[in-house]
Amino acid sequence: MKLRRVFGIITVLTLMVTVVQAEPEVKTVLDGLTNPAGIAIQPKTGHVFVSDSGAGRIIRVDERGAHNVITGFPLGSYGKGPKYGIGPLGLTFIDRDTLVVGGGGLPDGEEMLRVYKVPAAGASAIKAREMAASFRLTGDADTKGEGNFYGLANNGKAIFVSSNGDDTKGWVAKASLKGGKVTKFERSIATKEVVEVDAPTGVAIAADGSLVVGQLGEITVPQDALISFYDTRSGKLLDNFETGLFDITGLAYSPKGKLFATDFAWMDTSQGGLFELKVARGSQSGVEAKKVLSLDKPTALTFSDRGELYVTVIGTSKEGSPAGKLLVVSGLK
């Protein structure tokens, strides 16, 4: 694992009244990762936290370098055809000291949404078992247990969690928040029943407060990914759009309010990348997906307050060496 120091530079050339902006610039912040799958930026510090999923750990990237924060997560696998080792998945902060981690290394029904008190910068890493709290969505005779808590979106009142347990339901779960703590974790929106495409994965909160869900769809079916908008209180579907993308893995809004998605493109990963989604809500014109960058198996993305976009990619391994990276993209228009 190597840290590469990154200083975002946007070159603006001015000649009389003409301003030319540089194209988006991509730099590697961290490499040597094993199937990274989640990113969160710590409030107040701006430190970047990454779930190095296949290595079973959470890493902090700060001005001193890259450091383990939580280690020893259980490991499982995901996928058809090529399978990828996974452990911790989605990340979000409740506050500066409280990190929520979606698990992916245990069987459905045993998997946990985990809450941690994060060690201070420079302190020793803690073990995955040292949780402040944990929650499961177990099964019974009539209900399948849930797991692979991939995407986490926090609106301050609840954390919405995409899960991939019961493929006939496609649940987005809801972790209610009160006083900086998770008080309840329950199934909330059966997305497969509503939009008839399975595998909710990327999630985000829109400017109007609605929940945006990216349906990954079948990895053996081309360009079936959807984005859907739901009321966070009632769970009612507000809008649903085809995107023309293969497999949406992440969604994020920029500080300017633009919606971006990562497409893994499982069937043909050469078509994967970062896309800007221009959505005409309340109309039949749908979504215009504009490709911004080609990326090698992207899995997650998030913006800093300054507009820098952090993206994780699995990459293509050579001779068994981990090929995952944390990238930073600057200069997005």
Language model features: what each stretch is:
Residues 1-9:
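Bacterial N-terminal signal peptides that target proteins for export
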Residues 53-54, 104-106, 164-167, 215-218, ...:
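Short loop/turn segments immediately following the C-termini of beta-strands
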Residues 27-30, 64-74, 123-138, 182-192, ...:
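Beta-propeller fold detector
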Residues 109-114, 168-174, 221-228, 269-275, ...:
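Structural motif
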Residues 38-68, 81-130, 149-162:
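Acidic, Gly/Ser/Thr-rich repeat motifs that build Ca2+-stabilized beta-propeller blades
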Residues 61-65, 117-122, 176-181, 230-236, ...:
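Short loop/turn segments that connect beta-strands within beta-propeller blades
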